[in-house]
Curated annotation (Swiss-Prot):
Active site residues of this protein: C19 (cysteine persulfide intermediate)
Gene: tusA
Domain of life: Bacteria
Chief localisation class: cytoplasm
Protein name, as recorded: Sulfur carrier protein TusA
Organismal lineage: Bacteria, Pseudomonadati, Pseudomonadota, Gammaproteobacteria, Alteromonadales
Length: 81
């Protein structure tokens, strides 16, 4: 089985940042992307386990994969409309 995180077109390192900085950085990064492109987010703030999925739902992006069992957490999102 292939690693979905290795297929990301863009990457955002949010290690060491605390809420609300990771989501603010995700929003800024996604704005620069084309529809359908993917972003890998690497973070260690426990709040991202709640904030990243909520951000995706609210902004109509797809959360393609997540790894939140241990740090660093990883999220793969696809830009929506």
């Amino acid at each position: 089985m292939s690693d979905p995180f290795s297929e990301a077109q863009h990457q955002l390192d949010a290690l060491g940042l605390r809420c609300p900085e990771p989501v603010m950085m995700v929003r800024k990064s996604v704005r620069k992307m084309a529809q359908g492109e993917t972003l890998l987010i690497i973070a260690d703030d426990p709040a991202t386990t709640r904030d990243i999925p909520s951000f995706c739902e609210f902004m109509d992006h797809k959360l393609l994969a997540s790894q939140t069992d241990s740090t660093p957490y990883q999220y793969l999102i696809q830009k929506g409309l």
